[in-house]
Curated annotation (Swiss-Prot):
InterPro entries: PCRF, Pep_chain_release_fac_I, Pep_chain_release_fac_I_sf, Prokaryotic/Mito_RF, RF-1. Disulfide bonds: none annotated. Gene3D superfamilies: 3.30.160.20, 3.30.70.1660, 6.10.140.1950. Pfam families: PCRF, RF-1. It comes from Orientia tsutsugamushi (strain Boryong). This is Peptide chain release factor 1. It is found in: Cytoplasm. GO terms for molecular function: translation release factor activity, codon specific. Peptide chain release factor 1 directs the termination of translation in response to the peptide chain termination codons UAG and UAA.
């Protein structure tokens, strides 16, 4: 099927849906389904109409230039034609992006997990800085940031921390943050001024509901125990902490931040659903090799994706060779949009190249 035929089919489908909605013959269920499909097509049609209108304008302006005797009008048409031809590639790109299949999890909320890696106390401090960076980024995006768990260290770092981030387009924006983040800086305790390298791992999971993944109660092993603080001392006199093991996969989730065992169990189950759902998605991606071609980076969570170099004030994303000298703004203020927008654009470009959409 040619691309022009494909576009005409989309336009016809949109017009048919519009006629159905205005016909007044739909029951509530049909109305809801058709309204959703119509809403999904609307932004595509708007971009497509702008593209088609630009093409019509080019033909008209070319005709004016070829036939107009008035030199002033001819000159105006030439300028407008030049501007329209320069703008056309951007319109083409917008249409192509709108026609790409939407990733099924992009609309979901996300659970973000940060774990200290190699580097001892420095790694724990870096993990805490990253976790705070995502908190600040969520504030900037007007998203809700709900702490799920945190394992603090005595010097203000954290061994691991997780949060549920809720809002519009959360997973679509944060999904490229998964991987190994590396920091290069001089520790405060370093008397010789040597630069140390530490690392932390970030995992971003789409929030999963019970409808997304089936968990059989008999497959769960649930243990309770007393919560402990940073120094290992018990901070609660009751067995409020919960550890849930999913026996078939071996996935283990522990939760102790709440004083209530019931709340800890609910949070642990939320994380468990997300991890099991992610396991299924990762397995599916591995089975479909083509999905690897359209990812920014390898998609492997052991991949080093970004370096934060404090002496140079530099942040480098290795997947797209992007370097910004804004380390304080990024880490302290959560100004991640420039990095994330570039990652999204690169991913879209790879998808377009892989889809072979031609005008």
């Amino acid at each position: 099927m040619s691309f022009t035929v494909h576009l005409n089919k989309i336009l016809q489908k949109y017009q048919d849906l519009e006629a159905d909605l205005n016909g007044g013959k739909l029951d509530n269920k049909e109305l809801a389904l058709i309204s959703k499909e119509y809403s999904n097509l609307k932004p595509i049609i708007e971009k497509l109409n702008r593209y088609l209108k630009a093409h019509e304008n080019i033909k008209y302006l070319q005709q004016v230039i070829d036939t107009e005797q008035d030199l002033e009008l001819k000159s105006i048409a030439e300028v407008e034609l030049y501007d329209t031809l320069n703008y056309l590639p951007k319109l083409e790109e917008e249409v192509k992006i709108s026609l790409l299949p939407k990733e099924s999890d992009d609309h979901k909320n996300a659970i973000i997990e940060v774990r200290a890696g190699t580097g001892g106390d420095e790694a724990a401090l870096f993990a805490a800085s990253l976790f705070q960076m995502y908190n600040k980024y969520a504030e900037r995006k007007k998203w809700k940031f709900e702490l799920l768990s945190i394992s603090d260290t005595e010097i203000g770092g954290c061994k691991e921390a997780s949060a549920l981030i809720s809002g519009n387009g959360v997973f679509a924006n944060l999904k490229f943050e998964s991987g190994v983040h590396r920091v290069q800086r001089i520790p405060k305790t370093e008397s010789n001024g040597r630069i140390h390298t530490s690392a932390a791992t970030v995992v971003v999971l789409p929030e999963a509901e019970e409808v997304d993944v089936k968990i059989d109660a008999k497959d769960l092993k649930i243990d309770t125990y007393r919560a402990s603080g940073a120094g290992g001392q018990h901070v609660n006199t009751t067995d409020s902490a919960v550890r849930i093991t999913h026996i078939p996969t071996g996935v283990v989730v522990s939760q102790q931040d709440e004083k209530s065992q019931h709340k800890n169990k609910a949070k642990a189950m939320k994380i468990l659903y997300a991890r099991l759902y992610d396991l299924e998605k990762q397995k599916s991606k591995q089975e479909q090799a083509i999905s690897r071609k359209v990812q920014v980076g390898t998609g492997d969570r052991s991949e080093r994706i970004r370096t934060y170099n404090y002496p140079q004030g530099r942040v480098t994303d290795h997947r797209i060779n992007l370097t910004l000298y804004k380390i304080e703004e990024i880490i302290q203020e959560g100004k991640l949009d420039e990095i994330i927008n570039n990652l999204i654009s690169e991913n879209e470009a790879k998808k377009i190249a892989d889809s072979n959409i031609q005008f």
